[in-house]
């Protein structure tokens, strides 16, 4: 994860967290209550995990509990019209709460044209600060999410918004390539569990990147995994060191 927003300069870390996991896991929620005042916390609605945004009332509950730095607006996977409808309705609810943080809209669509139409509905709104591009949006474009980002840049559709990449590909090609590409200039940040997921499975991430190991799918109980034993912890540390090395590459922020 890397940010280019000067407003984040004071923050030690950026966290993307799930509203539905806050609801299910008191320990998880308590941790983010502690760090929300110092770190940059993005509250996600869990659309990728649940197939549709977690109930608005649940997400709003955790907006009030945590006062996060940024909130992901309601959306529905691959559904342009429902995403626009839900996001606009959620913005009204946030206004009623007098939420003063930032908001992230996540364009959706059944094809590339619909995705761009959805983007246009958010691009000029002053109450939308960030555009989130979820990983599977890349399936709408011939060359994946990198193709999507290149088209955004060519069409000059990035505007004055921050851009955040939701999730990473299993081979981590994007983290290896995007720092060297022109699209890097408007991307603020990325979140991914890949380095931790590999570690818990005993897999060194450099082996996945080299194609000599297969990426293990994230465990269903990922958010409830116990603290790792020493051998697994060593692999997780290795994977996080690889992440640090990738982030030292020449991002043009």
Predicted regions and their residues:
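Conserved radical SAM core fold
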Residues: 72-80, 112-113, 131-142, 172
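Short, well-ordered coil/turn segments that N-cap beta-strands
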Residues: 13-14, 37-41, 67-69, 99-103, ...
